[in-house]
Amino acid sequence: MLGVLLYCFNTEYYRYDKIAAKTVPLLKKNLGLPITIVTNFDTFKCMPPLGFINYKIVDNEKGNNIDNKPWHNLDRHRAYELSPYDQTILLDIDYFCYTDHLLTLAETDQDFMVHDKVHDVSGNDSYKFARSSMVPMVWATCIIFKKTERTKAIFDMVRYIKERYNYFCELYRINFRNFRNDYAFAIALHQLGGFKGYETIPTRLPTLPGGAKVTKVTDTGVSWVWQGRVGSIENCDVHVIDKGVQNV
């Protein structure tokens, strides 16, 4: 069975349950797949009615920060054990799914795929990280995996890297010192693949950078303003970084 797995943990600054209220209906509409949300009890109590959802209540690991704010991203390595599906589309909760493109990507013989390139939909070409580490970064925003021994080893390796992240930052000269799943998965794939290449999602991850402030969300697209310029995207999946989208 193919299904979608999401993580949703509120913080004192951001209400991810409000973002889920916008993205989950889009997933249901455009993918028509069963959905599992991994969350904690405090966030679960805030969740709006979303129809049939399989909830996994966990005590999420804490201690990571970004921009001096809590960043609850330390449990993604548990996706293999927490997913009830034979094949899983693992997504960030702020992935706005406006197409059925992910269904096509899931029609693969590969047991693990992740984006290694990103497309800045604002047109500002914001993502240039080639000099930020010695290992090419991947984007853990969207991962498609099957339950195999190989994929289990990948997620186990991510856990191992998380527990020793400072060491791996030194080893791979990673500038971003707060734990980041993008680098953890990149290192895991690099090492478990015998330092060779690995299969990736053959498209760029459409992303709206955090500098773009979302002004409107509809059933078909997102609008924003950035540096005095207005932009929008229609009928295309997009990963929205601006957490202010919770209030739009």
Q: Residues of each region from the PLM?
A:
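Glycosyltransferase catalytic domains, chiefly GT-A lineage
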Residues: 1-248
